[in-house]
Design a protein with these regions (language model features):
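Active-site-proximal substrate-binding groove within the catalytic cores of carbohydrate-active enzymes
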Residues: 171-172, 177-366, 372, 376-388
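Aromatic- and carboxylate-enriched substrate-binding clefts and catalytic-loop regions
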Residues: 68-254, 648
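Aromatic, loop-rich ligand-recognition surfaces of beta-strand-rich domains
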Residues: 20, 548-612, 626-671, 699-705, ...
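Conserved structural scaffold segments of CAZyme catalytic domains across common CAZy folds
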Residues: 21-116, 122, 268, 274-309, ...
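Short beta-strands within extracellular/lumenal beta-sheet-rich domains
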Residues: 311-317, 554-577, 588, 675-691, ...
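C-terminal beta-sandwich/jelly-roll accessory domains of carbohydrate-active enzymes
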Residues: 322, 329-527, 532, 536-550, ...
């Protein structure tokens, strides 16, 4: 018997013509959902075992939430790689896939998923035999393993003109085998074979946040630029936008995916890549919800209508048919925006004599009522967020449709029971009513308590604990005022150096997500962090404290020395004040300790409060021991020049190694007063907060031009220094792939608010090392 299961969660919210199919699809072909593995691996390529684990993750989403994935695509390195062509007969391929693609294609097929692969357009060699081998291999992927997609990329190389004919012939055979085969063309001239291309890369943009796509404006999160992306001018769907990257800077990924799936809604949608297993456990139901909602309506989402920007905001679109439309709205400003939505032909709805039902589907589901055709309703969109609104005159497709309260669907596809999370503000009571859905239930419960009236179409009252907020949780607190350079400017600077880190962006995502209780998620995360190439790139400060001298943490120089001022210090935070007899620094070789040389003296700086620093002289070497027994208690350690590469940092007390589980280090931030890092202008804001929501944070928006790494922010709480652990664009990092984007304007620093800050005097500072023309604000 079906059961309706509801749980409550306090939240902060505001209501608010067919052509020949030469390329495998037409403008009216429904989208296919895709994941591709770029950033899960880089040009070294995937392996069979890692792919098996990743497919297990998607099988879990399929079985748990009913999520359908049409295509799982290997990215670079599986066969072809950057500037090279490969073969399934090569030793390299056999090392990566000892049993070939067969087991993986069968594993994918068990959940109705087809494999795809990144490749180059050529590889036909210089003889007829070599050309035949290439064509047979690529055709065999489709014939023998039911591959459904090739992503052909100029990174591998262009197609030679004398190979136009074998390419065209190969793709003609593939189209015969699989008429719906998808060929993605990334920056390639394929000659006559261009007719086989399904899509072309939209704007040439990749979407790896803060590597290839980063904010150009101040914003409360890292994905403001991503949600600013435009749809193709002619609303073509036969292009590819590189999907949504789930690897770095994950907050508000769902807005990004809503706009990709329901806004641009290209032939590949929803399209994600990299490391979706980095999401928090509680976010996976929403990932599945977006995929499932899109799949339910994908046949009609192919029809698009631009909405007037003056009424509906930037890049607003309506998709659907005469009876059902989905509107994607966005707000690219710091204040909430209310849009007036006309329930008529302006939004694509055609009058059939029935009421128009309006329902918000993102950022949560909320019933907006039934209205007469031609009415106008208002929908509020939160700052730097997206909204998805459904208008329909048709019967409800949702199994459950509630009114009176915002909610998320946790699971309505797998199994008989439907699970809903009710959302509410602290101290508020809601009257929840079950509207007519397309399923019938024998019972209902809220937080384990019977609420069977809901199953019969009745109502229930739901109250949320806590006190109602006096003010809207998102608000401007202050426009910061210019002030004298504070005497403790170095301490403020160091507070953020110690609060932040230089780990790979993926490591930061793991820290955001916390531990998982889902075996398939843990396996996929571990498969990523334990892959040999990730460990070998020295991207994680954890390697300094793991007791394994074969792992290291290094200053990344692969793309040259990109440190501000070409200098950086080593910062070590012990997590709490301690007394130690010795600090031991280990390096793998003499080169690694540069710019130091063995048997030279150096100074180590120790502090308990970021104000008073005690120098300790020690002798440099591949194993350097600093005697700290007379230093008293300290928490913060600073070495003016960071060694290029360290394998371990140890602490000893009474002959025993101390616990280092709370230690962390960074190696890319300058020391104050070096490399141009000196405060020339300052701004301050002082205030007290008597209320804020759980998970709240301050945004210090540095509006204006400040130069590359030319401005900083931090806070004092009743005199205690509190740094910013995050910033958009991201703090410089030892990146997993490519490099951090560098910007010289409009950085936004983030400071988490904790319960101990309530009622305390908060002093927020912005420090500029260059420009006096900033207009900082605190939100």
């Amino acid at each position: 018997m079906k059961k309706l299961i509801l749980s409550t969660a306090i939240t902060c919210l505001s209501l608010a013509h067919v052509h020949a199919q030469q390329g495998g699809a037409t403008e009216t072909t429904p989208s296919r959902s895709e994941y591709f593995s770029w950033i899960n691996n880089t040009n070294e390529g995937a392996t069979a075992e890692q792919t098996r684990i990743n497919l297990d993750f998607f099988r879990w989403l399929h079985d748990k939430y009913g999520m359908e994935l049409d295509i799982y695509a290997f990215d670079a390195g599986a066969i072809d790689g950057a500037k090279m062509y490969g073969s399934t007969k090569s030793d390299r391929f056999k090392r990566q896939f000892p049993e070939g693609f067969g087991p993986l294609s069968r594993q994918a097929a068990d959940m109705n998923t087809r494999l795809g692969i990144w490749c180059g357009p050529d590889g036909f060699g210089n003889s007829e035999a070599e050309a035949k081998d290439r064509a047979d291999m690529m055709t065999g992927l489709v014939k023998d393993h039911n591959f459904g997609l090739f992503k052909m990329d100029a990174v591998c190389g262009q197609l030679r003109k004398d190979k136009y004919e074998p390419f065209d012939s190969m793709m003609t055979e593939i189209r015969r085998l699989s008429p719906d085969f998808v060929l993605l063309n990334h920056r390639l001239d394929l000659g006559p074979g261009t007719r086989h291309s399904t899509t072309f890369l939209l704007g040439g943009e990749e979407t790896y946040i803060d590597v290839f796509m980063t904010n150009s404006m101040t914003a409360p999160h890292h994905r403001a630029q991503a949600i600013s992306r435009k749809a193709p001018e002619n609303l073509t769907r036969l292009t590819e936008d590189h999907g949504v990257c789930l690897s770095s800077c994950l907050d508000y990924w769902e807005d990004d995916l809503i706009l990709q799936s329901f806004g641009r809604e290209l032939i590949l949608a929803p399209e994600i890549y990299a490391n979706p297993w980095f999401l928090r456990d509680e976010e996976f139901p929403y990932l599945a919800f977006i995929f499932n909602l899109h799949r339910t309506y994908r046949d009609i989402l192919v029809n698009a209508l631009r909405l007037p920007e003056e009424s509906y905001g930037p890049e607003a679109l309506s998709r659907g048919d005469d009876g059902t439309r989905f509107l994607t709205l966005r707000n690219l400003s710091w204040q909430p925006v209310t849009y007036k939505i006309k329930l008529d032909s302006e939004t694509g709805i055609i009058d059939n004599g029935k009421k128009v039902k309006a329902r918000l589907y993102h950022p949560y589901i909320y019933d907006l009522g039934s209205h007469n055709y031609g009415d106008i309703i208002e929908v509020e969109v939160l700052p730097f967020r997206a909204a998805l609104v459904k208008l329909t005159t048709q019967p409800e497709k949702d199994k459950v449709a509630l009114s009176g309260i915002p909610y998320h669907i946790i699971n309505d596809k797998a199994g008989d029971d439907v699970e809903i999370k009710l959302l509410g503000m602290p101290g508020q009571t809601y009257k929840v009513k079950a509207e007519k859905g397309n399923a019938h239930f024998a019972s209902a419960q809220i937080n384990g308590n019977a609420a069977n009236a809901l199953a019969r179409g009745g109502s229930a009252r739901v109250s949320f604990p806590g006190k109602p907020f006096k003010e809207f949780y998102h608000r401007l607190i202050d426009r910061m005022q210019s002030c004298d350079i504070p005497a403790d400017a170095p301490s403020l600077y160091y507070a953020t150096c110690y609060a932040a880190d230089n780990n790979a962006l993926e490591v930061r995502s793991l820290a955001r997500s916390g531990e998982t209780e889902i075996p398939q998620v843990k396996a996929a995360r571990d498969a990523f962090t334990e892959q040999e190439i990730f460990r070998a790139r020295d991207l994680w400060d954890r390697y300094l404290f793991d007791g394994d001298e074969s792992t290291c943490f290094s200053v990344k120089l692969r793309h040259g020395d990109r440190r501000a001022g070409n200098t950086s210090a080593l910062y070590l935070d012990l997590g709490k004040s301690v007394k130690l007899d010795e600090l031991v620094f280990k390096a793998p070789d003499e080169y690694a300790i540069a710019p130091y040389k063995s048997q030279e003296g150096a100074l180590l700086w120790l502090s308990d409060n970021l104000v008073d620093w005690k120098p300790i002289t020690f002798i440099v070497g591949t194993k350097a021991v600093a005697d700290t027994r007379d230093a008293g208690e300290f928490r913060y350690v600073r070495l003016s020049d960071s060694p290029l590469r360290l394998s371990e940092i140890e602490g000893w007390r009474d002959g025993k190694a101390v616990d280092r589980s709370k230690w962390h280090a960074s190696n890319l931030f300058r020391e104050y007063n070096r490399g141009g890092c000196k405060t020339r202008h300052a701004w301050k804001s002082e205030f007290t907060l008597d209320e804020f929501a759980d998970g709240a944070y301050l945004c210090v928006a540095l509006n204006g031009h400040h130069g590359r790494e030319g401005a900083w922010a931090a806070m004092k709480v009743d005199g205690r220094y509190v740094g910013c652990p995050d910033r958009a664009p991201s703090f410089t990092s030892n990146t997993w792939e490519h490099l951090n984007v560098e910007t010289d304007s409009n950085n936004t620093y983030y400071i988490p608010l904790t319960p101990d800050m309530l009622g305390k005097k908060l002093e927020v500072y912005a420090l500029s090392f260059e420009s006096p023309d900033l207009k900082p604000e605190v939100w």
